[in-house]
Structures are given as C-alpha cells and as structure tokens.
Amino acid sequence: MVWVRAAAVAEVADASAIDVELNGVRVCLARVGDEFYALQDNCSHRDFPLSPGEVDPDECTITCEWHGAMFDLRTGVPQCPPAVRPVPVFTTRVENDSVFVDMPD
C-alpha cells in the first residue's frame, strides 16, 4: 500500500463527493464534516459511479443516483437494495491541507 495525494481539503465540500483516479483506480472521495472517506467509485449493483450521488451526513452514507443503492461511507456495506455486495474502501488521512488515500501499489 502507498499513500497517494487525492485532493486539497478545500476541493471537497462538506456533505459531498468528488471522483479522482489514483493508481489507475476510480475513487469516490467523500467528506462529512472534517472526516474524509474513500471508496471505489462504482456501485456494486450496476457498476455506475457513486461520486455523483447524494451524501447524507447524518447517516454517513452515499446513495447511487442511478438506482438508489445506498452505501455506508465508512465500510462500503450496502444499506438497502438493489445493491447486496459491499464496495471496497480505502483509508484516508489529512496532512498539510491535502487528503491522502492509502492505495494498493
């Protein structure tokens, strides 16, 4: 695993997500308050990107805008159908106003 800079803290608004490509992997980088979450940017239901979806800061989830599958940002576990398989998650850290993601090398 290797730490890769994903974005500046200011690039990710609270209760939102952006898409980034890190080491050849599409990653959904989401923010809830001062916490950042990274998960593979594809819904396990139909392989559509998750990053355009709605982030719920109270539940710490993201909802796929295509079919409504909801995933826990912390674990990648689906919270409702139609998705039944989790999506991979990656560890994040903030350093010097940048967000880093621990990615496979």
Predicted regions and their residues:
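N-terminal pre-ligand scaffold of iron-sulfur
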Residues: 1-61, 72-73, 77, 86-105
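Detector for the c-type heme attachment site
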Residues: 67-70
